[in-house]
């Protein structure tokens, strides 16, 4: 990495700090952004924030958010650095309409051939040269904006804030999310479109746009059959779009797999059927598939202790989650800026997983998103050190002192797997534009209202044994679920985690942004024993949790094999 700037002041990155004059990175939290995929395993891309550049002169270009290509094999570029900045010094006339502040996130990603890169909300093009080639210079580099109906990606377009875009491995399609926040709704929908270069306008347009959503009951998490029999239905389980499988033929997303645990799913573009990739991550969203398709690298909250009080009991079906509670549970995963992510290697064959950095410093937390090297032998991810207000002052956790070069609060990690031999990446053919189960989308088209189960009493049979009786209540219009209660009688989907007892969740008002109150009195038996209980008046979460501000009334405690897990302090 470039050295750390002594300060943000102009000129602080002197020749004494970096004799090559190729810049210094900021020491601030998050200054080393997400790594990005490159098709040659000797390199990885990385978004960074430079600081301390002089106001004038050749080194002045190393300023603000930029994208690097970084050597991973211990060698250097001709100037002696292990990195090359590929966006620094690009003339403004060569990048019109591009949001350079997005160079650190979403992650950069190389198109097949490594001559074009997704950087920020644009496509960097170095003509006939790969970006690692010395002949690829700033003057010869163009960054073309990506537009949706004439508006730049990243803007609020058609009522939805476009975010979290990811390049399909086919190099032809892009996926993204639209976050919809109005007075009466808070939702997110996934999209896919084809990148088409408009020569006359010198930009990429997103065409053949499809919303990766279907309002039919066949694509909802639970389906009601005759006699009120409920059936879990893994289809359309994208939730928030998070990327692609290695062959580009399935969208990665997050949805509840067990109650109060938000897991990774792969949903087929051809059929809409979904399969879980993680079994009980508690929460995950940063993820990347190995180029050979055999592994995932998921950043998960399990193992950090953050969500164990609400997510720690396995074997509970995601019934109360259908209120929905997902946004509230996911909000607990952060303490202000602090994320509690840990990197896990996950098998795509059976979901078995292992923490990559077990025994690491818990004050360093993984940051979105990770990436694999192209030969599927190693992974790269960024980490941030906990900083105020998540530590210090009234917080019981003292703020640690960074031991990284220059005292910086971000770092980039590379983990190699000696037992994984180099293997070729899947070479995906372009996927079809049409998604048969999706919804063709035209800008301005109203966002759908997600369907839900109607009020009533239902029965859910365990896949292995037992039953659950489910009671759903709605508001007077039937438009909003206001409460879900469940009674479990020897319920088990896997035959090893057996659930008995009752639980419920309710809105405290007929509003999407209402406080939510949980009542839990559950018992676990089988391979583990435990309880999940709330205080007599329940556990109530403020909607401030949607802004990652933990404010709760009452308590929830989960005990597994004698170990009790309690909630964070308010404000933590």
Stretches with model-predicted labels:
Residues 1-572:
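Sequence signature of WD/YWTD-type beta-propeller architectures
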